[in-house]
Curated annotation (Swiss-Prot):
This is Fucolectin-1. A motif (Cell attachment site) lies at residues 100-102. Ca(2+) binds at D59, N61, S70, C167, E168. InterPro entries: BG_Antigen-Binding_Lectin, FTP1, Galactose-bd-like_sf. Parenchymal hepatocytes. Disulfide bonds join C71-C167, C103-C104, C129-C145. PANTHER family: FTP DOMAIN-CONTAINING PROTEIN, SI:CH211-215K15.4. Residues 29-178 are annotated as: F5/8 type C-like. It comes from the Eukaryota. Transmembrane segments: none annotated. Its main location: secreted.
Length: 178
C-alpha cells in the first residue's frame, strides 16, 4: 500500500508541472465522466422529468436535442448546479461540454466548471477550472484548466436564477499507459 501511495504521489508531482495541452508520452487522455454518477440541484416535475435526468449528461452521447433524451435539465431556480462523482481521484486537464441545440443556448453563459474533492456547498467551493463566457446553441467546446487539477468531483455551477441544461459533459483525465 505504501509503495502504491508513493508511486501515486510521484505521478501527481510529475504531471502537475505540465499544461493541459502537453500530454506526456506515458499518459493518455480519456473521458472518465462516463464511469461516474451524476446528480443535480433540481429535477423538473411532470412529463419533462423523464427527459431531464442528470445521468443523461454523461451517457457518451453528444446529441443536443433535448427531446431525444440525452440532456440533463434543472428547473428555473437560483444558482443551479450539476455534478459528476468520478468515484476516485483523477488528474483532470479539461472538460468538454455540449450545449443544448434545439433552443436556449444562451442559458449556460456564466457557468463555472469546478473541480475538487469537497462536497461542501454541493461542490461549489471547489477550485475553478474555467468559466463559460458564452456558447452557441448546440456547440461542443473544450474548456482547458490552467493546469491539471486533481479531483473526484466536477461541478458545473450557474451563479444566477436560470435553467442549467447540459447535453454532454466529458471530463478529460490523464491516465498512465500500461
Amino acid at each position: 500500500m505504501k509503495v502504491k501511495t508513493i508511486m501515486l504521489l510521484f505521478q501527481i508531482l510529475a504531471i502537475s508541472t505540465i499544461k493541459s495541452a502537453d500530454v506526456p508520452n506515458r499518459y493518455i487522455q480519456e473521458n472518465v465522466a462516463v464511469r461516474g454518477k451524476a446528480t443535480q440541484s433540481t429535477l423538473p416535475s411532470g412529463a419533462g422529468a423523464v427527459l431531464s435526468l442528470p445521468g443523461f449528461a454523461i451517457d457518451g452521447n453528444r446529441d443536443s436535442d433535448f427531446s431525444h433524451g440525452s440532456c440533463s435539465h434543472t428547473t428555473n431556480s437560483p444558482n443551479p448546479w450539476w455534478r459528476v462523482d468520478l468515484l476516485q481521484l483523477y488528474t483532470i486537464t479539461s472538460v468538454t461540454i455540449t450545449n443544448r441545440g434545439d433552443c436556449c443556448g444562451e442559458r449556460i453563459s456564466g457557468a463555472r466548471i469546478l473541480i475538487g474533492n469537497s462536497l461542501e456547498n454541493n461542490g461549489i467551493n471547489n477550485p475553478a477550472c474555467s468559466v463559460i463566457g458564452s456558447m452557441e446553441t448546440g456547440e461542443t467546446r473544450t474548456f482547458h484548466c490552467p493546469q491539471p487539477m486533481i479531483g473526484r468531483y466536477v461541478t458545473v455551477y450557474l451563479p444566477k436564477t436560470e435553467v442549467l441544461q447540459l447535453c454532454e459533459v466529458e471530463v478529460n483525465a490523464l491516465l498512465p499507459v500500461n
